[in-house]
């Protein structure tokens, strides 16, 4: 499930460092988190949709790797992002 343009723009303005910032880890993690929450809601209704479940696991792994990178590079930005998004630190893959 992909995000529509309005949602992407809203996430970029909220988490980006400048206009059109799509590459920073904060924006990427925020977009992945939104897609993960959307897929989680979808799977609550469609319990046997195994293709979407696999996609969800791939997205969670991708988000975990981005969070590990951010924790290694700048722990303050990592902690601020985890607090803003409400992600558990254990799920983020950093100590």
From Swiss-Prot:
Per the record, a Pfam family?
A: Ribosomal_S15
Q: Name one GO cellular component term.
A: cytosolic small ribosomal subunit
Any Gene Ontology biological process: translation
Per its UniProt entry, which superkingdom is the organism in?
Bacteria
Summarize subunit and interaction data from the UniProt record for this chain: Part of the 30S ribosomal subunit. Forms a bridge to the 50S subunit in the 70S ribosome, contacting the 23S rRNA.
What does UniProt give as the signal peptide span?
none
Functional description taken from the UniProt entry: One of the primary rRNA binding proteins, it binds directly to 16S rRNA where it helps nucleate assembly of the platform of the 30S subunit by binding and bridging several RNA helices of the 16S rRNA.
Q: Does this UniProt record's set of keywords contain Ribosomal protein?
A: yes
Keywords carried by this UniProt record = Ribonucleoprotein, Ribosomal protein, RNA-binding, rRNA-binding
Task: Check the record and name the Gene3D superfamilies matching this protein.
Answer: 6.10.250.3130, S15/NS1, RNA-binding
Protein name stated in the entry? Small ribosomal subunit protein uS15
Q: Which CDD domains match?
A: Ribosomal_S15p_S13e (cd00353)
Picking any one GO molecular function of the record gives: rRNA binding
Family, per entry: Belongs to the universal ribosomal protein uS15 family.
Q: Which InterPro entries match?
A: Ribosomal_uS15 (IPR000589), Ribosomal_uS15_bac-type (IPR005290), uS15_NS1_RNA-bd_sf (IPR009068)
């Amino acid at each position: 499930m992909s995000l529509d343009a309005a949602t992407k723009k809203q996430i970029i303005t909220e988490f980006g460092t400048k206009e059109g910032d799509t590459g920073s880890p904060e924006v990427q993690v925020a977009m992945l988190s939104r897609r993960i929450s959307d897929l989680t809601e979808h799977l609550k209704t469609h319990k046997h949709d195994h293709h979407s479940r696999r996609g969800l696991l791939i997205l969670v792994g991708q988000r975990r790797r981005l969070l590990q990178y951010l924790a290694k590079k700048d722990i303050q930005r990592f902690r601020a992002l985890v607090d803003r998004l409400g992600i558990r630190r254990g799920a983020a893959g950093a100590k």
